Amino acid sequence: MPRVKGGYVARRRRKKVLKLAKGYYGSKHTLFKSAQGQVMKSLQYAYRDRRQKKRDFRKLWITRINAAARLNGLSYSRLMHGLKLAEINVNRKMLADLAVNDEKAFAQLADKAKESLNS
């Protein structure tokens, strides 16, 4: 029996890896072996960073809310506690958006939080 080198199946597999490696620098987008290693690493980075992105955005929202809260004479934690006491359920993403785009509305929320903290 003649030896079979893989042919069609192997070519398809290599082509798939090289397609994923498109845009990489140097030999990493032309040579299969180095492309395969880089593609594997890239997929690991993508997996990790899809989870990291959620944490990064939450940090950003909290930073923005804290800055706006301090302009209104409250700390972040006191603002959030005051809103909870006032039974105002607004998530951090929306609060951060208000802090950046609608300062008057955010100031009203901060006043409500202050009132509920004092009572």
Swiss-Prot record:
<keyword id="KW-0694">RNA-binding</keyword>
<dbReference type="Pfam" id="PF00453">
    <property type="entry name" value="Ribosomal_L20"/>
</dbReference>
<protein>
    <recommendedName>
        <fullName>Large ribosomal subunit protein bL20</fullName>
    </recommendedName>
</protein>
<comment type="function">
    <text>Binds directly to 23S ribosomal RNA and is necessary for the in vitro assembly process of the 50S ribosomal subunit. It is not involved in the protein synthesizing functions of that subunit.</text>
</comment>
<keyword id="KW-0689">Ribosomal protein</keyword>
<comment type="similarity">
    <text>Belongs to the bacterial ribosomal protein bL20 family.</text>
</comment>
<dbReference type="GO" id="GO:0000027">
    <property type="term" value="P:ribosomal large subunit assembly"/>
</dbReference>
<dbReference type="GO" id="GO:0005840">
    <property type="term" value="C:ribosome"/>
</dbReference>
<keyword id="KW-0699">rRNA-binding</keyword>
<dbReference type="GO" id="GO:0019843">
    <property type="term" value="F:rRNA binding"/>
</dbReference>
<dbReference type="GO" id="GO:0006412">
    <property type="term" value="P:translation"/>
</dbReference>
<keyword id="KW-0687">Ribonucleoprotein</keyword>
<dbReference type="InterPro" id="IPR005813">
    <property type="entry name" value="Ribosomal_bL20"/>
</dbReference>
<dbReference type="GO" id="GO:0003735">
    <property type="term" value="F:structural constituent of ribosome"/>
</dbReference>
<dbReference type="InterPro" id="IPR049946">
    <property type="entry name" value="RIBOSOMAL_L20_CS"/>
</dbReference>
<dbReference type="InterPro" id="IPR035566">
    <property type="entry name" value="Ribosomal_protein_bL20_C"/>
</dbReference>
<dbReference type="GO" id="GO:1990904">
    <property type="term" value="C:ribonucleoprotein complex"/>
</dbReference>
